From Swiss-Prot:
The keyword Transferase applies. The gene is ribH. 5-amino-6-(D-ribitylamino)uracil binds at W27, A59, I60, E61, V81, V82, I83, N114. This is 6,7-dimethyl-8-ribityllumazine synthase. The lineage of its organism: Bacteria, Bacillati, Actinomycetota, Actinomycetes, Mycobacteriales. GO terms for biological process: riboflavin biosynthetic process.
């Protein structure tokens, strides 16, 4: 995965023995489907052809499903999009999802990568969704983060 402005270059790595799960919401379908495609591509490039994929309605449902997935997976990727509207709902959802995913990761000692886009506009989300016209692919980036963290944790635990 090639880096752009501030985005690290992630070298190719073999994660073929990592049990990967992806939970993706369905609001803003075009964006979420693109994030999921990027995640699947990165998984395949890393040797994982069939990650577990679970779809949920909205972003707020992602943490509890991620929590369940940590029970039998080595890494979880959370994908979705929350676009700012005219009410404080955006702030509540973004905070709840971010805190929920962080708590799940720490409580389970399992990497849970946060690929939930929190943007001010649909245009910003589309630009990060991994579409042909996008500048970034947050689905791919989150998957690389989850997998490399799982491999790092495996190494650290083997040394202990």
């Amino acid at each position: 995965m090639s880096g752009g402005a501030g985005i690290p270059d992630v070298p190719a790595f073999d994660a073929s023995d990592v049990r990967l799960a992806i939970v993706a919401s369905t609001w803003h379908t075009k964006i979420c489907d693109a994030l999921l495609a990027g995640a699947r591509n990165t998984a395949a490039d890393s040797g994982i052809d069939n990650p577990t994929v679970v779809r949920v309605l909205g972003a707020i449902e992602i943490p509890v499903v991620a929590q369940e997935l940590t029970r039998n997976h080595d890494a979880v990727v959370a994908l979705g999009v929350v676009i700012r509207g005219e009410t404080p709902h955006f702030d509540y959802v973004c905070d709840a999802v971010t805190q929920g995913l962080t708590r799940v990761s720490l409580d389970s000692s399992t990497p849970v990568a946060n690929g939930v886009l929190t943007t001010n506009s649909e245009e910003q989300a589309l630009n990060r969704a991994g579409l042909p016209t996008s500048d970034e692919d947050k689905g791919a980036q989150a998957t690389a983060a989850a997998l490399t963290t799982a491999l790092t944790l495996r190494e650290l635990r083997a040394e202990a």
